[in-house]
Structures are given as C-alpha cells and as structure tokens.
Curated annotation (Swiss-Prot):
Pfam families for the chain: Actin (PF00022)
Family classification: Belongs to the actin family.
Protein name in UniProt: Actin, muscle
Keyword set includes Cytoplasm: yes
Assigned GO CC terms: cytoplasm; cytoskeleton
Record keywords, A-Z: Allergen, ATP-binding, Cytoplasm, Cytoskeleton, Hydrolase, Nucleotide-binding
Length: 192
C-alpha cells in the first residue's frame, strides 16, 4: 500500500481480512487465522483490487540472489519470453571468487555473442541485446533491482548505468528496504 508516484510501497502486508467482532488486517489477521471464520458467501461479495493507472508497465526486473540471476524485460505489461535471461552466476559465486581469488571466467562470458543456424539454413547472430531497439529506451526508463546481490554498493549507479548508451535516461528502482524484506520473510515470501 502507498501513494501513486512513490518508488516503493509504504506498507507491505498480506491481503487477508478477518472480522469476528473487530476488523483485523494484514499480519494481525494472519496471526488470528485459526480462529477466524468467514461468515459470508464469497460468491456474493466481490472484491475489487485496483492498480494505479499511472504505474509503469514497461521495464526490466533484475533479480539476483545467492545462486541464480534473472533479467526479465516487461513491455506494456507483458513479459518478453524470448528476452528473459537466466544466469547461474550470483552472490555465492561472487563470494567464492572474492574469498579464493580465482580467475573468474564463465561460459556466459563467452556466449554473449553467438551465431545460430536455423532449420531453414539461415544464420542469426544473437548478442547481449535481446530486445527490439525501438523499446530499449522504454525499458531503461524503469529498472527494478531485487535480491541480496543487488545490495553491493554501486551496483545500480556504476554497473547498470554502464549498460545503457549515454543518450538514454535510466531510472533505477532499488528500494533500500529490499534486504529487510528478505531477512524478515526469506524465500517463503515467494512460496506462499
């Protein structure tokens, strides 16, 4: 919950409400879950959830945690499956590299530019840019960072900004409370 235009929600709580005599919302309702009963037929009481109309519908989500990194481009509210990138390189690998001092070359580095032959014989080259050039400006305008590995100092300003041409305006949303949210709920928050 929050106000339109805010970079992050002002409050995060489960979407559950219970009413024995008083109204309970969020975590308080969750804690009383065993003693709550719904005294209404759900099919007779519709619920309306709204999304602020001016929220961005285009951008890139970079989620990098302990074992895997995902980049997911979203355009006009739709995920672009052909451009999703999964990289089995994340925080655990960076920690191992820094503590052991190993040379850090991966197959992912060698595969940034690669040619593929299609069944019809046509050869295409796929580079690190997987989204149409016409939408890249829109994608760079809304980048959401998530996961513990994005907490490294300077990752937003230095690393993400370096990926865009200097003429493109970049907006990076990296809420400082993302670590506390993970510490509080852990991976269980995505497995509810």
């Amino acid at each position: 919950a929050g106000f339109a235009g805010d970079d992050a929600p002002r409050a995060v709580f489960p979407s559950i409400v219970g009413r024995p005599r008083d109204a309970y919302v969020g975590d308080e309702a969750q804690s009383k879950r065993g003693i709550l009963t719904l005294k209404i037929a759900p099919e007779e009481s519709p619920v309306l959830l709204t999304e602020a109309p001016l929220n961005p519908k285009t951008g890139i989500v970079l989620d990098t945690g302990d074992g895997v990194t995902h980049t997911v481009p979203i355009y006009e509210g739709y995920c672009l499956p052909h451009a999703i990138l999964r990289l089995d390189l994340a925080g655990r690998d960076l920690t191992a590299y820094l503590t052991k001092g190993y040379s850090f070359t991966t197959t992912a580095e060698r595969e940034i530019v690669r040619s593929y032959e299609l069944p019809d014989g046509q050869v295409i080259t796929i580079g690190n840019e997987r989204c149409d050039i016409d939408i890249r400006k829109d994608l760079f305008a809304n980048n959401v960072l998530s996961g513990g590995t994005t907490m490294y100092p300077g990752i937003a300003d230095r690393e993400i900004t370096a990926l865009a041409p200097p003429t493109i305006k970049i907006k990076i949303i990296a809420p400082p409370e993302r670590k506390e949210e993970y510490d509080e709920s852990g991976p269980g928050i995505v497995h509810r």
